[in-house]
């Protein structure tokens, strides 16, 4: 069996569209957040999702210690916020760029996110360079934004909500 090279894998994954999310935490280790597209549902009984986080990321120790997080799914027009949380911008500046509320777990919840999933990390599995965080959902908040936001082919794209 041949070993695939990293670039081939990344090029193929660029063909897989995914929602754009800002993952936040707050607790004993402090406040932190990052942009992620490696998020998906696991089961609805109990409601659980997963988030993949590189163990080499500057935010990893904070999430690892706090053991809570909020997945904030972005809507179209929130690309600048995604870029802030995806770069080297200081944490205080990231959070100052938007309006937040405190979720049930104490994590920051983006006021105008398409959906926010306030969670407790229930299990962590390490694979390669990343930890897979299995997250039990404590509460969900939805916003009636007209368009979703996805990352596809290395760029942002708006998704129109169908008219009812």
Swiss-Prot record:
Superkingdom per UniProt: Bacteria
UniProt-listed GO biological process terms: nitrogen utilization; uracil catabolic process
Keyword RNA-binding attributed: no
GO molecular function: FMN binding; FMN reductase (NADH) activity; FMN reductase [NAD(P)H] activity; riboflavin reductase (NADPH) activity
Keywords: Flavoprotein, FMN, NAD, Oxidoreductase
Assigned EC number: 1.5.1.42
Free-text function comment from the UniProt entry: Catalyzes the reduction of FMN to FMNH2 which is used to reduce pyrimidine by RutA via the Rut pathway.
Protein family according to the UniProt entry: Belongs to the non-flavoprotein flavin reductase family. RutF subfamily.
NCBIfam families: RutF
Protein name stated in the entry: FMN reductase (NADH) RutF
Organism the protein comes from: Enterobacter sp. (strain 638)
Gene name in the database record: rutF
